[in-house]
Amino acid sequence: MIKLSAVILSIGLLVGCSTKPLEVKKETVHPNWPVQIKSYDEAKLSWQVKVIDGKAWVGMPFEDSQEFRIWLNDVKRYVHDQKTMXCYYRQELKEDKCK
């Protein structure tokens, strides 16, 4: 009899102390679009105008053009990465930017 009452008492304590699980509301976060990229330092560029066969050609020295191209590739990578990241989190909004 003592064992039965001990079992009933312990079951009563376990059931009596339990609570219903609280429902946690999941908040969706939509990150903002990144800030615009700053322009290339144009002071580094040395544009040149050359006239060849009566036609004017605008260009820059080879070393400057390579640095400029590296910067443009970095900009392209940055924009692609940011767009991919932001579109992943904003896919519920079905924006035209993310298609």
From Swiss-Prot:
Membrane-topology descriptor: Lipid-anchor
Keyword terms of this UniProt record: Cytolysis, Host cell lysis by virus, Host cell outer membrane, Host membrane, Lipoprotein, Membrane, Palmitate, Signal, Viral release from host cell
Source superkingdom: Viruses
Lipidation (N-palmitoyl cysteine): 17
Gene name of the encoded protein: y13J
Primary location recorded for the protein, binned into one broad class: host cell
Residues with lipidation of kind S-diacylglycerol cysteine: 17
Ranges of the Periplasmic topological domain: 18-99
The protein's name in its UniProt record: Spanin, outer lipoprotein subunit
